[in-house]
């Protein structure tokens, strides 16, 4: 409370995280030790009855919920409600617990405590009102629901797989009920501020597991439509290998919120919890800008300031975080100037960003059920319980989604700066899917009947579907289900003997598995293997079309991006910005006839590209010209920015920090990169007589109805005065 009042004194907005779990590297995760010592029945337990640890509680335990309710009610009434309507220093948001489901994910185990097993039985009864339904599904005789114990063994039979599916689904219901429990307490206590929870999933600088964590709230988002799903961004080491990871995290949270409300990073890396794992200012500034151009509109640094823990309170010792913007003595550290600059830029451009859109004509299907594997395949795959071959599956779901989906399709699209959205196939309407010029779906052998029918209808209604490497043959309960294949009229006849693909001008391209051989009756052949067997077809279905390939591609050789491009016909997908090579990552956002162009260099050496960007005020692309960026730097360039009644910045090779005008003329604050040649192109009806940069005259030329100004940039905010 003292901290909140101090923030109020200095007119700083406050978000609060009262728990029950607060984590933040505190001892016992913020759960009071007296709770589990006095009431051991509150502890979460594994399948052998052993407690997970003294700080891990069962979310369904009535005693835990009673104590948590009293605490949250008290905190809400005493701290939040009196401060939520203040004119300055208000509490503006409140976090619901912290990274719900993280301990189940990290431990690869569900909660087998008595309270949770009771909830499990209730879940089964609600899901299967007739016991016979459940018995048929599990292919066994049942006399009561109590006979169905949660799974813990290796998954080698289809019955075991179905039981694990139910166990995963049950925990998602637990998380939804838990969020609802906390939300009800806070709202009844009078809290009116927005509520949010946060999703984790970055491991060693990769976000492969973020989508899995996002599925924890597959049921929460339906029960709590106003809840914000904050996301954690912990890239650690920024490089071309994880350029796409932040985008995926943004998109998963965006889909959970059904593309409404602000996209908010509740934990945006600024510093490191591990001494020796040092993020550097330039790479973080690049990462922040990349996340912003891809939709991030709310940022909470974790952590902006270093802290010193009271004795015994820090699980990692006396110091809390390293390499922050300021240390625990409030002294500026190397990251401070970068964040200060970004803050100044956001202050000027923030209103644009909250309204701007990133047009996308390509959708990439996101199928959440593919990610519901946390109890079968532990993080990093250590000690997996899943044996796909014994289940009759050709594709390991985790390896498939990581290699083909995440580091295959998504990485290639990001590398080529193709604007696209992740589209949740289980929640997007037919109309929403049809808004995309092309929908790309990576499918394994399992997909529920409703989604299969949805995709079939998408094609018949005029959609263009690109799908690979197989068509589903089972539903999620391992019942035969070929609705999509039957609707598309596509049949496969086994696997070929060569893994080399020939398509268009691409020859002898290796793929990870032997491709499926496809019957091409009534279809156009578009890909073959080295033996001439058909591995890809295209055909018309109703008003739409489908391209099916019996293979997928990794990204390990130079030709793989070109093969992906040919499969998805990427040259025909409209771009918001284009470059003459893939060395820079580029993207743009637009609103009210104005735009913002991001150019970023994720490499560890200088890179250059000739850039053009879609003109928000006309059909012709705007030629931005050659942009060369030092290693791991990025810029947000203004496009068609109205800066006065009769003057527009067509483009600049610097970030626009401020605009002022007086009797002497127009004054633009521009900040570029030290040593980079400055280019500013203005369009104005008035003749320009003189241009000065920081009071020194610089050359300019008239080109048609525009004026081009050239100068040298010094890495600081430079005032360009135009009279």
Per-range role (PLM):
Residues 1, 22-33, 200-209, 418-436, ...:
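Aromatic-lined carbohydrate-binding/catalytic grooves of carbohydrate-active enzymes
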Residues 1-39, 183, 187, 446:
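Aromatic-lined substrate-binding rim segments of carbohydrate-active enzymes
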Residues 14-18, 92-96, 195-197, 229-231, ...:
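Hydrophobic faces of well-ordered beta-strands that scaffold small-molecule active sites
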Residues 19-23, 96-101, 200-205, 234-236, ...:
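Active-site beta-loop-alpha junctions enriched in small/polar residues
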Residues 36-219, 426:
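Polysaccharide-binding and catalytic clefts of secreted carbohydrate-active enzymes
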Residues 68-69, 76, 89-92, 145, ...:
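Carbohydrate-binding surfaces of carbohydrate-active enzymes
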Residues 185, 189-245, 275-288:
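Extracellular glycoside hydrolase catalytic/binding regions
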Residues 673-675, 681-723:
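Beta-strand-rich ligand-recognition modules
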């Amino acid at each position: 409370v003292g901290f909140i009042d101090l923030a109020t004194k200095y007119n700083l907005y406050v978000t609060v995280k009262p728990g029950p779990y607060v984590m933040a590297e505190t001892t016992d995760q913020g759960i009071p030790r007296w709770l589990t010592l006095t009431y051991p029945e509150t502890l979460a337990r594994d399948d052998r009855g052993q407690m997970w640890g003294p700080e891990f509680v069962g979310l369904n335990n009535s005693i835990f919920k009673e104590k948590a309710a009293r605490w949250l009610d008290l905190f809400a009434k005493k701290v939040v409600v009196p401060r939520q309507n203040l004119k300055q220093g208000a509490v503006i948001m409140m976090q619901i617990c912290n990274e719900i489901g993280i301990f189940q994910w990290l431990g690869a185990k569900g909660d087998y405590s008595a309270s949770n097993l009771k909830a499990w039985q209730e879940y089964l009864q609600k899901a299967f009102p007739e016991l016979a339904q459940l018995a048929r599904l599990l292919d066994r005789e049942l006399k009561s629901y109590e006979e169905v114990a949660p799974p813990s063994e290796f998954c080698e039979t289809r019955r075991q797989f179905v039981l694990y599916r139910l166990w995963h689904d049950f925990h998602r219901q637990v998380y939804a009920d838990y969020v609802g429990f906390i939300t009800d307490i806070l709202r009844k206590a009078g809290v009116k501020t927005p509520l949010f929870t946060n999703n984790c999933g970055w491991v060693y600088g990769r976000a492969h597991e973020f989508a899995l964590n996002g599925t924890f709230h597959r049921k929460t988002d339906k029960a709590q439509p106003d809840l914000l799903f904050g996301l954690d961004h912990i890239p650690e080491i920024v490089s071309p290998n994880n350029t796409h990871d932040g985008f995926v995290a943004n998109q998963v949270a965006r889909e959970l919120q059904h593309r409404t409300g602000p996209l908010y990073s509740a934990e945006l890396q600024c510093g490191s919890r591990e001494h020796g794992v040092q993020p550097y200012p330039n790479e973080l500034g690049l990462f922040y800008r990349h996340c912003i151009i891809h939709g991030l509109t709310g940022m909470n640094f974790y952590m902006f300031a270093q802290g010193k823990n009271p004795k015994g309170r820090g699980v990692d010792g006396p110091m809390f975080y390293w390499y922050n913007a300021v240390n625990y003595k409030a002294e500026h550290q190397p990251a401070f100037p970068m964040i200060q600059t970004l803050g100044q830029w956001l202050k000027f451009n923030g209103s644009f960003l909250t309204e701007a859109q990133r047009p996308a004509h390509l959708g990439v299907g996101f199928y959440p059920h593919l990610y519901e594997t946390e109890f079968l395949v532990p993080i990093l795959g250590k000690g997996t319980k899943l044996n796909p071959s014994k289940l009759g599956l050709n594709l390991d779901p985790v390896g498939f989604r990581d290699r083909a989906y995440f580091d295959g399709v998504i990485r290639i699209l990001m590398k080529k700066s193709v604007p696209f959205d992740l589209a949740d196939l289980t929640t997007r309407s037919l109309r929403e899917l049809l808004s995309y010029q092309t929908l790309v779906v990576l499918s394994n052998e399992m997909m529920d009947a409703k989604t299969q029918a949805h995709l079939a209808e998408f094609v018949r209604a005029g959609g263009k579907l690109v799908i690979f490497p197989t068509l589903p043959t089972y539903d999620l309960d391992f019942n035969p289900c070929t609705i999509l294949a039957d609707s598309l009229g596509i049949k496969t006849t086994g696997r070929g003997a060569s893994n080399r693909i020939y398509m268009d001008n691409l020859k002898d391209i290796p793929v990870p598995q032997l491709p499926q051989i496809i019957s091409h009756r009534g279809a156009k052949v578009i890909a073959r293997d080295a033996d001439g067997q058909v591995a890809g077809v295209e055909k018309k279905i109703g008003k739409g079309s489908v391209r099916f390939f019996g293979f997928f591609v990794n990204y390990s050789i130079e030709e793989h991006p070109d093969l992906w491009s040919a499969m998805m016909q990427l040259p025909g997908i409209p771009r918001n910005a284009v470059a003459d090579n893939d060395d820079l990552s580029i993207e743009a956002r637009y609103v009210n006839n104005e735009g913002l162009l991001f150019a970023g260099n994720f490499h560890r050496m200088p890179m250059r590209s000739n850039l053009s960007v879609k003109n928000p005020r006309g059909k012709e692309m705007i030629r931005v010209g050659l942009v060369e960026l030092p290693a791991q730097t990025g810029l947000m360039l203004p496009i068609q920015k109205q800066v006065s009644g009769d003057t527009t910045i067509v483009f600049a090779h610097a970030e626009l920090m401020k605009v002022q005008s007086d009797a002497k003329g127009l004054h633009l604050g521009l900040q570029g990169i030290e040593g980079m040649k400055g280019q500013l192109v203005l369009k104005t009806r008035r003749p320009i007589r003189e241009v000065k940069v920081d009071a020194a005259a610089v050359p300019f030329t008239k080109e048609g109805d525009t004026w081009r100004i050239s100068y040298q940039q010094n890495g600081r905010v430079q005032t360009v005065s135009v009279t």
